[in-house]
Amino acid sequence: MVALRLIPCLDVSNGRVVKGVNFVGLRDAGDPVELGCRYSKAGADELVFLDITATYEKRSTLVDMVRRTSESVTIPFTVGGGISSLNGINELLRAGADKVSLNSSAVKDPSLISKGANRFGSQCIVVAIDAKKNKNIPNKWDVYVSGGRNNTGLDAIEWAEKVFEMGAGEILLTSMDGDGTQNGYDIELTKCIADKVPIPVIASGGAGCLRHIKEAFTLGKSSAALLASLLHDGQLTIREIKEYLIKENLPIRPIE
């Protein structure tokens, strides 16, 4: 059985890691390369760096940060934010990223997914979906872009199926309702999408305790759990989470 993954998420704004609640109220959480290095040594399986202001401010993700990170960490890492072309993907992969995450740009031009997958391989192309529950229509989640600012009107489940068909190798699924709240992942949303696509789904948004992380895997059917506030604030360590999940008989790579 494929090992389930724990992935610290570092939201980057102006070269610093930040954390907020429901995509707003950002506060400083440290230097991205230093934090990435710390989590790598602490036993994380992968890392995700998301330049959350890159798309909104229309500037490209800092290649320098990727290069410095690749020299410092020993685990795979994904970079997203402001990537809107094959050249942009190529630049980040050449700088040392293992995968790139496409979000707003994939909605604007879905062919970027297939072109990226054809040129660099599906394993390099992650599509990030920021989803928010539709208050008027049951069992519907809307896809948001531009750092959660704009509702596209797209149905998140249908969009997930489309990005798989276009060649995405993985989906990074963030519940905007859960983001930073520590009230638990949106299990219903995660399971709906994990059941619809045969590629890994990373659950994101809402982890507040050990049980939440277990439920993302057992109930939500996710392949990985993204963690931010819980780790940045020192409430839990990766070791504590892994030891708990191993005791719960989940297939987790132990810390050596």
From Swiss-Prot:
Localization: Cytoplasm
Classification via Gene3D superfamilies: Aldolase class I
Pathway per the UniProt entry: Amino-acid biosynthesis; L-histidine biosynthesis; L-histidine from 5-phospho-alpha-D-ribose 1-diphosphate: step 5/9
Sections of the chain in a coiled coil: none
Pfam family, one: His_biosynth
HAMAP family named among the record's database cross-references: HisF
Role summary: IGPS catalyzes the conversion of PRFAR and glutamine to IGP, AICAR and glutamate. The HisF subunit catalyzes the cyclization activity that produces IGP and AICAR from PRFAR using the ammonia provided by the HisH subunit.
Protein name: Imidazole glycerol phosphate synthase subunit HisF
Biological classification of the source: Bacteria, Bacillati, Cyanobacteriota, Cyanophyceae, Synechococcales
UniProt gene name: hisF
